[in-house]
Amino acid sequence: GYIAIGVQSTSSGHLSTAFGTKTKASGAYSTALGVGASSEGEGSIALGGAASSKGKTSIAIGTKVKTVGESATSIGYGAEASSKGAVAIGLDSKAGDGNAATGTAGANGINAVAIGTGAKAIAKNTISIGTGNVVSGVGSGAIGDPTTITGAGTYSLGNDNGTIAASNSGVFGNNNNIKGATSGNRVIGNNNTVEVTANNALIFGNNAGVSAANGIAIGEKSASTSEGSIAFGLNSKAGNGSGATFGLAKDAIAIGTNSSARGDKAVAIGKGTQANHDSNIAIGNSAETGRDLTVSNYDIKNISIGYEAGKGMNGQFNSYLGTNAGQDSKGDGNSAFGLRAGKTVTGNTNTAIGMDSGQNVEASSNTAIGLNAGQNVTANGGGSNVAIGTNAGRNVTSSIGDIIQP
């Protein structure tokens, strides 16, 4: 039951076959074909110069190919499958525990698959497909060009995603940088960054970043820089950064192109909106709640809703509703409701209700209700006035406490 054909070929396994110079078939039912080929495992096949199949029912095809693991498969020059069920396909590809010497390699590398030049899958249930990928995290996989994965349960689909130590994560795209041994991250896009403290980060876009836990960045160049913050839109920024000096800016939300929410629980919605302090709300294109970053976040609570509402304002406890309402105003406790209401005010606790009401005021505690009411009130005796009606109380410099009607 032995067949040996070739110079110095030997066939010692039951029903084994050796064909070629210095071939050796020592495993039962094994086949060795090629110069120096060796089939030692039962039912194994070695095909190619210096090919070696040591594991039971293993297959080695190619020059200097080696299969050590039981039921393992190696195909390609220098390929090596060294653990049970491992598959290595491609030039110098490696699947399984590289230190294994026999077909019983243990847990590491079992059911590993490596396909591609220099690909390595060296942990249990791993997949490495592509040139130079190295996967050593249990249950992880890399598909594409050189990426190294050491974290467990992590997959990378794309090229040049560096070394990923994060566990239970997914990276889909190219040139992404996942720093540190984080977990639960999801990245879709190119050239994105997840910092070392950012567990459970979500990025969808290009050139975006998350630098704190549970952050979300969606959109080109979006950035989530504080815990639980959400940035949605081109160049959107949510979190403590870009000059903010107080607070942690947790749970901030910025939605819209160039929007910025830099305070704790701040909300900025709309193109170019800015909510720079804690619990501030800015809604509407270019709406703002104050640019002064030298005052403690805890002292500033502003709300601006409307196109350019509160833009250029400086103060605290102000509320502006309407297009251009409260624009370029300075002071505390002011309220303006209506188109351009309360615009260019310097003073405190003023109230303007109606289109163009309460504009250009340099005084405090005035109330203007109606179209154009309470415009151009000055501090020279012009405080604490009430103007009700269209055009009422314009250009007032009268005594304190007047009630002015048209």
Residue ranges, per PLM feature:
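Glycine- and small/polar-enriched repetitive beta-structure motifs of secreted/surface proteins
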Residues: G1-P406
